[in-house]
Amino acid sequence: MLSELRSINSYNAWVVVFVAVGTIASAYGLAIIGSTVGEPGFYRYFGLAPKGTPGYDHTTNMVGALNGVNSAGAIAGSLLQAWTADAFSRKRTIQLGSVILIIGGALCSGAVHMAMFLVGRFIAGAGSGILTCIVPIYQAEVSTAETRGAMVAMTGVMYSMGYSLAGWLGYACYFTDPNSPRASFAWRFPLAAQVLFPLIVLAGSPMLPYSPRWLLQQGRREEALSVLERLHETPEDVQHIKAQQEFDLIDEQFKLDQTLSLGRRFELFRTAPNRRRALVASLLMWGDQFLGVYVMTNYGVIIYSNLGVTGSIPLLLNACWNSFTMIGNSWTAFSVDRFGRRTYLLTGTVGCIVSLIFLCALSAQYLGSDHLPGLRAAVFFMFFFIFWWSFFMDATQYVYVAEIFPNHLRPQGVALGLTVFYLASEVTLVGAPVALDRIGWKFYLVLIIPSACYLVTLYFLFPETKGKTLEEIGALFGDTNVATVTEGQRMEEGKNNTAELEKPEFASPEKE
């Protein structure tokens, strides 16, 4: 870990927060369908039968398809960014994802038949997949070791904000008269709003710096050092000593990677350390998805309706549920660097599993009855679940998957993790509406059993990464060729840096 002499500066904070708006765009695009399926006008426009009427089986299949094609698009986007992030830069990939999401959102909001809507959902999913992958990569690469957890956790904070906005806008539009000529406004306007955030990112993206690690890989050394100096300058380190130290560390790791010929195809699976990283990333994202958070987010309205909640209240509960995640993710951003990634993942998983067990038991006992205390208790455990997810899991997963891979494999590694994430969502989201209708409470067992296995893998396979540079994390996975700084060197450098800062004749590295 680099010396703690340095703290975050305002420019670094602005870069991280602004690029996280791309995560709002991604989350909103994924979540808005959860509000859409709660709008009566949506069912009428596309000729879908509501719950309790003949033809509802077809409706559940179509609702599952709307989420399925979105996840399929997200998989395509995740894989595409694995190439574009290295070929054209992280910055250009952020711009690409924004453009694609704008196109998809426009098609969804203007859809005149279901085929057009499905195509729009696929394209919007591709844009979301790109942004969900590339934003935490970029944030990790412009952050310091001491602040990386908080910086990348902004992905989770903004993700929850996107879901919250989707929930509240859907609730507000519910009160549009379904018999009026403007009835389609209730579902078209929330869908159209998803283009706003990628437009903001696209407009402001020219002001973003290129990733210093990507610049170094392209041989643009002076520009890389200049970016590091601007990102990490503080009043205590006006001579840019720490920026130079980090530059040297990145440069040394890049040279080691080159000497080991690490640019080969399928490098992600060639060595034992890389295979372990790939396994950990895949287990993390698959396991998190099977905890059921996307099921509750996208089908919360349906779940609340099954629990006897009627009218606009399911949409209101869904909006409140999503809003609560903002509090939890904000907590993670300020605390994950102190308590650690592994600790949070273990704690959150245990809490989520316990919540699912109680939700399953209460649903088994009271689903379909008029026993209000039992049904309300089931609703409570929906909110108890989101406490554990948002305070410990949501933001932490993005921090962890973005930091465990070396620089030259980070886009591919994160793409693998997020591809697995969306594959798992394909399984859960496509099957959930049919399963909730056909087998009811038994569906929760499909989530509980894999989640218990996931908890075991978390305990035995996931190392703690807090406080280490991206280059030093490699040693945790068994890399022997790692550019690092020993503890003794750190202490000595800290003394030398302090002494040098007191000398008026100290010459700082030249800026570009």
Describe every region a protein language model picked out.
Residues 231-244:
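Short intracellular "coupling" helices and adjacent cytoplasmic loop segments at the cytosolic face
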Residues 243-257:
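Cytosol/matrix-facing amphipathic helices and coiled-coil assembly/linker segments
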Residues 1-232, 254-512:
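Alpha-helical transmembrane bundle of multi-pass membrane proteins
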